[in-house]
Amino acid sequence: MKFIHTADWHLGNTFHGHDRSEEHHHFLKHLLDLISTRRPDALIVAGDIFDTPNPSARAEAMLYDFLLEATSRAQGLQIVLIAGNHDSGSRLEAPAALLKSHNVYVRGTVRRKDNGGVLRLLGGRRPDHGAEPLPE
């Protein structure tokens, strides 16, 4: 299995009042080109997709435009979005049902199966079931 792992996009970020959307656009274009040439099975975006829990409409549009373009360029590509400390997990999960129809899976909040314990990550084709308690 081949995947691309990325994080800390911080879409919507400004630097000392300077709008960074052009930089973000160039990064996302580069990532789309990489997806087209490398043909990964999955793209994992591990947190801090946005720079703030309440991103601008422009930042959200940039994400959703990217997701649609990425899944159209690489048939069968699965995308996993994981919320970071700058993201609102519930806001990121809000369109999860719609995104799932495009092979985009969102995990914004932690769901525990028990009251603690060691968890192990599971492989396979069940992105809705990513961890289970490790047997004692």
Where do the model's predicted regions map?
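Metal-dependent catalytic neighborhoods of phosphoester/phosphodiester hydrolases
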Residues: 16, 49-67, 83-102, 106-108
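N-terminal active-site segment of His-dependent metallophosphoesterases
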Residues: 1-68, 75-76
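Residue-level detector of flexible, active-site-proximal loop/helix-junction positions
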Residues: 10, 86, 113
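A generic structural signal for short, solvent-exposed coil/turn residues
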Residues: 1-3, 71, 98, 111
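Proline-centered loop/turn at the N-terminus of a beta-strand
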Residues: 2, 78-80, 105
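Cofactor- and metal-binding active-site motifs of prokaryotic enzymes
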Residues: 53, 73-74, 78, 82, ...
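Divalent metal-dependent hydrolysis catalytic cores, especially in the metallo-beta-lactamase
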Residues: 42, 80-83, 133-136
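Conserved catalytic scaffold of divalent metal-dependent phosphoesterases
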Residues: 97-98, 102-136
